[in-house]
Each structure stands twice: as structure tokens, then as C-alpha cells.
A protein has these predicted regions:
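Conserved PLP-enzyme active-site core in the AAT-like
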Residues: 16-39, 43-281
């Protein structure tokens, strides 16, 4: 009897607990599960999964970019983007607390053979002036600076967001120095909702964008990498090399499409809840 009461008490406590470890600790809604149950599927490695094709086309159109590819994780989309943009012995410029540097298992070195130039930013954000100062001169003794990567929102910056004017200035620096510009947009929709921006605002400024379908949006798994057609064609090859080619993946792709179509605006509710918690603490 004592054991049963202890089990009941533990179950009750768990039912009253809110898990704040991550915005990925979610469960699909009944409506999302219904979409998953009825998802049309095919072989995505052969480009024949209609649900994945719909997701990729929808996302590319949303951002005003030419093409997109679905991957299992944001780490994979980031690493594929870096691999596509660089050659071994080149250099990637990013903020010191960036996810691509802190949380992707040394993937830049392992997958792309590149070194990293770290910038000490302000809550995860860097400026055009800092990027300019970080670019290596054309010197055979130096690694060639090839790619700048931004993160918006910045995870270890406490969810800080870039202003569009600041991104435009960084874009100009990249153009002037022939560098590509990648966006780790795992939580980009939080920034879009908070700042009342549009996805196409970002699509016009970056060579590649990675977005996550689970962080804040409630899909069980998956990320999308966006870019030009030739870039995404190359990305599909690296996705296969990294083990990211899936077969009947429309089951999870359908959940991701549902999340994009129904769950973005409700991020404003999350933001209000976060403000209430911050004020209470």
C-alpha cells in the first residue's frame, strides 16, 4: 500500500511539473497526429515522397528562396551548409557562443576541415565592424576567410534577436569581401514573431538558411536547409554522405509542414509566458 501511494504521489508530481529544459520537449497535438496518420509517403532519397516535396516547396516559397532540402536535425543542416560553402583549410567566422561551434561536436573540423574565427559578441550577436576586422588578409600564411555564420535567435544569448539593418550591414561586408553568409535559424520564427518580420526579409539576405521544425513549433523531428538550386543539389549529396537520406520520411515531414502552417503565430503566447515567468522570478 505504501509503495502504491508513493507511485501515485510521483505520478501526481510529474503531472504538475512543467519541463523548461528545452522548447524541443514537446508532444505532437492531436491535429498534428491526424495529419501524420494520413500523410502521403514515397521514397525521399529518390525524390518521390510527396509530403517531403510539399514541405520543401512550401518552405522555399515562404522564404523566397529557390530550393530546400529536409534533414533529420539542425546540426545536420548547419554542417551540410558549412560543407557546401567551404573547402578544407578555409575559415568560418562566427560568434563565440554559436551553436555551430559550441554544440555540434566539432563538426566544422570533422566534416569540413575548416578552422573557426571566433568573435566576442553581445549576447550572441556580432556587428559588421567585427566581421570586417575578423576577415583574414589575402596572405598564403593565413586561412582563407570564406563563410560568416549568424545565429538568430541566439541560444546562448538568451534568445537575443538581430535587427534587420545590422544583418544588411554584415551582408554588405560579405559581398565586398566575397564571403558567403549562412543563418542558423533554429529559432528564427521566434525572432520573426517578436520583431514582426517576414521570412522573405531573411531569404533575401542569406546564401543559406537552416530552420528547425521542432524548436517552439511542436513537430517531433526535422530541419530544413534553404538556398539556391545548385547549392541544394550539392547539399543533397552531402546529406546522403552524412546518413541523412531517409525513405518514407513524409510521416515526419507532414508534421513539420503542419507546424509551419499552424504553429508560428502562437509563439507570441510562448513569449508572453516567458515574460510572466521572468517577472515572477
Amino acid at each position: 500500500m505504501v509503495f502504491k501511494r508513493a507511485v501515485w504521489a510521483l505520478q501526481y508530481i510529474r503531472s504538475m511539473t512543467i519541463d523548461f529544459r528545452s522548447d524541443t520537449v514537446t508532444r505532437p497535438s492531436p491535429a498534428m497526429m491526424e495529419v501524420v496518420k494520413n500523410a502521403r509517403v514515397g521514397d525521399d532519397v529518390f525524390g518521390e515522397d510527396p509530403s517531403i516535396n510539399d514541405l520543401e516547396a512550401f518552405t522555399a516559397d515562404m522564404f523566397g528562396m529557390e530550393s530546400a532540402v529536409f534533414c533529420p536535425s539542425g546540426t545536420m543542416t548547419n554542417q551540410i551548409a558549412i560543407k557546401c560553402h567551404t573547402q578544407p583549410a578555409e575559415e568560418v567566422i562566427c560568434e563565440r557562443q554559436s551553436h555551430i561551434y559550441q554544440y555540434e561536436g566539432g563538426g566544422i573540423a570533422y566534416n569540413s576541415g575548416c578552422q573557426v574565427k571566433l568573435i566576442e559578441g553581445n549576447r550572441g550577436r556580432i556587428t559588421a565592424e567585427q566581421v570586417t576586422a575578423a576577415i583574414n588578409p589575402d596572405d598564403i600564411h593565413k586561412a582563407k576567410s570564406t563563410l560568416v555564420s549568424l545565429e538568430n535567435t541566439a541560444n546562448r544569448g538568451g534568445g537575443s534577436c538581430y535587427e534587420m539593418d545590422d544583418i544588411r550591414k554584415i551582408r554588405k561586408v560579405c559581398d565586398d569581401n566575397r564571403l558567403n553568409l549562412h543563418l542558423d535559424g533554429a529559432r528564427l520564427f521566434n525572432a520573426i514573431v517578436a520583431k514582426k518580420q517576414q521570412p522573405k526579409d531573411f531569404g533575401s539576405l542569406f546564401d543559406s538558411i537552416s530552420i528547425c521544425l521542432s524548436k517552439g513549433l511542436g513537430a517531433p523531428v526535422g530541419s530544413v536547409l534553404l538556398g539556391k538550386k545548385d547549392f541544394i543539389k550539392k547539399a543533397r549529396r552531402f546529406r546522403k554522405v552524412m546518413g541523412g537520406g531517409m525513405r518514407q520520411s513524409g510521416i515526419i515531414g507532414a508534421a513539420g509542414l503542419y507546424a509551419l502552417q499552424h504553429n508560428i503565430d502562437r509563439l507570441a503566447i510562448d513569449h508572453e509566458h516567458a515574460r510572466q515567468i521572468a517577472e515572477a522570478l
